Amino acid sequence: MKASVIIPNLNGAGWLRDSIESIWAQTEQDFELIVIDNGSTDESLEIARSYCGNPRYHLIENSENTGFSHAVNQGIAMAKGEYVALFNNDAFAEPNWLEELLKTAESDPKIFAVSSLMLRYYEPELADDAGDYVTILGFACKRGDGLKASRYQKPCRIFSACGGAALYRKSILDKIGVFDALPICF
């Protein structure tokens, strides 16, 4: 299997179905979808359960909010794909999203992570995140936040990929470890 797409969810009833449907509509179909519900109290768990008949779909139900890192780590532990794609429950993917991330990752075996160009929902001409960078003082910042998305169309090196919509090489995650589950992270 080429990829495992992981969506952590907490009370995302307003957008979870559209997020999941945007993943099912991908041009690249060699993937499984893993949703981790973190103790939702809205209708999002019912939405997540409605996909359980699909053999490429897996649902993990946590009884309480274990946090982003712990939830995605649960998904990574279950993932069968060569790559792991993290995707926020309020994100919506273009049909070629996964195909393009995989193409970039496979262009060089040294690539560990590929970040998406994330756009603002109500201002789609503006970037929300184009990967992260570190300032001279050591602060991590979102690259491109609030700037014209057209400035970020070409691949480049980044410090880190935003876990809201990114692809990671699973073999490297297996070697270096997964996301730090400290409550201060994410």
Language-model segments: which ranges?
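Cell-envelope/extracellular polymer assembly enzymes that use nucleotide-activated donors
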Residues: K2-S4, E32
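Short, acidic, metal-binding catalytic loop of nucleotide-sugar glycosyltransferases
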Residues: S22-D30
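A conserved acidic beta->alpha catalytic loop
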Residues: S22, D37-E46, E64
